[in-house]
Curated annotation (Swiss-Prot):
The gene is queA. The lineage of its organism: Bacteria, Pseudomonadati, Pseudomonadota, Alphaproteobacteria, Hyphomicrobiales. Signal peptide: none annotated. GO terms for molecular function: S-adenosylmethionine:tRNA ribosyltransferase-isomerase activity. It catalyses: 7-aminomethyl-7-carbaguanosine(34) in tRNA + S-adenosyl-L-methionine = epoxyqueuosine(34) in tRNA + adenine + L-methionine + 2 H(+). Pfam families: Queuosine_synth (PF02547). Transfers and isomerizes the ribose moiety from AdoMet to the 7-aminomethyl group of 7-deazaguanine (preQ1-tRNA) to give epoxyqueuosine (oQ-tRNA). This is S-adenosylmethionine:tRNA ribosyltransferase-isomerase. One of its GO terms (biological process) is tRNA wobble guanine modification. GO terms for cellular component: cytoplasm. Belongs to the QueA family. It comes from the Bacteria.
């Protein structure tokens, strides 16, 4: 499909720079393409009204790490140059793939010392070698540290990698360390939050428990590739960046039991959905799964296991707007976003939420 079919105009004032307080007071646009009135306006706190006892919410429990690194590039015969790197996928205990700027001036073999003046980890400076250089500013960094020592060093000198549409308007601050993390995050490795989960509070969890709605957790480490624009003119020519994760055998069995009892699988966030669909057989059975997924969902995709999706409002021409268009219908989602813009919904990572029912085949 032509990528420009997924374009729309979004006024700057619709981009949220801070989350709603409290989190579950954010607005919730319910989108049911199978209903006569497909759109209705609510609050996230109303979520239990649209779920049934025996349904299962699937959360992504990845935890955002301070993956934005600032440093100085060193090269024989050349002076130091300031560079930045956003880590997006770990490939070994001492290696990370990253998006580096300025990408054109970084070469294989360069040494980079990360951390501003006065910043250091408990073992000193955080240094790496550019082991490989790929396309679009992507590099493979081989750090001098490894394993837990590297983790602690990154935590000491790194910064929360705010999405570019927020970072362009304000700097990261201490509030973001809490705001840009779900209350159930536990598996470190993401460089972007699974933002649909940001709306959940302990009180909302209690309400879900009282309603008999199950909660299950999977892990997909969201990479910085989620923010990359689609530069191709046709979706067939776009290549997704890989993201690593897993679905345990225990969780797969529990979700299959939910489906067998007639319950619905409700994914909280596109990352949970992409992981479950990667793990599902054509029959809909969810299998234990571990690895890297580059699943790219566009209209025409046949969903195998997911019945409902809670997600924030996404960028024009993005792979995520393509995904929701595949899930609830292309025309329905364009109408929903038009309604959201005209009625003041807040967009993107810190914005409001939508609850989508899967379009009947």
């Amino acid at each position: 499909m032509r990528v420009d079919l997924f374009d729309f105009d979004l006024p700057d004032e619709r981009i949220a720079l801070r989350p709603a307080e409290p989190r579950d007071s954010a607005r919730l646009l319910v989108i049911d393409p199978n209903a006569e009135n497909s759109l209705s306006d609510h609050r996230v706190g109303d979520l239990t009204s649209f779920l049934r006892a025996g349904d299962a919410l699937v959360f992504n429990d990845t935890k955002v790490i301070p993956a934005q690194l600032e440093g100085i590039r060193h090269r024989d015969g050349a002076g130091g140059q300031q560079v930045s790197a956003t880590l997006h996928m770990r490939t070994s205990p001492s290696r990370w793939k990253a998006f580096a700027k300025p990408g054109k001036r970084i070469k294989q073999g360069d040494r980079i010392s990360f951390g501003h003046s006065g910043e250091s980890c408990f073992l000193g400076s955080l240094d790496a070698t550019v082991e490989e250089k790929g396309e679009a500013g992507e590099v493979t960094l081989l750090f001098d540290l490894s394993g837990p020592a590297l983790d602690e060093a990154i935590a000491a000198v790194g910064h929360i990698p705010l999405p570019p549409y927020i970072a362009a308007k304000r700097p990261e601050d201490e509030r973001d360390r809490a705001d840009y993390q779900t209350i159930y995050a536990r598996e470190e490795g993401a460089v972007a939050a699974p933002t649909a989960g940001l709306h959940f509070t302990p009180g909302l969890f209690e309400a879900l428990d009282r309603a008999g709605i199950e909660r299950h957790f999977v892990t997909l480490h969201v990479g910085a590739g989620t923010f990359l624009p689609v530069k191709a003119d046709d979706t067939a020519d776009h290549k997704m960046h890989l993201e690593s994760g897993y679905v345990s055998a225990e969780i797969a069995a529990r979700l299959n039991a939910v489906r067998e009892r007639g319950g619905r699988i409700v994914c909280v966030g596109t990352t949970s959905l992409r992981l479950i669909e990667s793990a599902a057989e054509e029959s809909g059975e969810i299998m234990p799964w571990a690895g890297a997924t580059g699943i790219f969902i566009t209209p025409g995709y046949r969903f195998k296991a997911v019945d409902m999706l809670m997600t924030n409002f996404h960028l024009p021409r993005s792979t995520l707007f393509m995904l929701v268009s595949a899930f609830a219908g292309f025309e329905t989602m364009h109408a929903a976003y038009k309604h959201a813009i005209s009625t003041g919904y807040r967009f993107y990572s810190y914005g409001d939420a939508s609850l989508l029912f899967r379009k009947d085949r």
